Amino acid sequence: VTLATGMNGNNTCWVEGEARMYIDDDKYPSIHYTGTEDYFCGSYGFGNDVQIKSYQTYSGLYSGMYAIYGDNRAFYNGQQRFLLYRFHVADPIHFETGFRMTLDNMGWTGPRYDDYTSCAYWYQTLPSAPLKPLPSDKEMIMK
């Protein structure tokens, strides 16, 4: 499972949303993270609030916040946009029949008016049915 997400936040704290993963037929989350920043491995608000007091991009092998858009990077200030990713390679999430993930829109300041977009991928080693062969280069040429 891989998750890539984009977030357009207002000028309040947005990092406390809890990530929950439901595996197969679970009614309660099998995996439960305590905050958005924890799930994306950028704890303490994606920066150093003691010295820097601003968001910082970071890129790791399996997680990161690779882009911040907006003129003001100060914590909880302005209309910033963030792009984050998390690959579950070192900590794969195995499931048999189904997988569902939720990400709460929470913070410790005021009501939330954020916009989230996300895309999740999953990989399997064997297809459940034979796949059609890919078209040849000649077949791919537009006519």
Enumerate the predicted regions with their spans.
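Beta-strand-centric surfaces of beta-sandwich/beta-rich domains
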Residues: 2-143
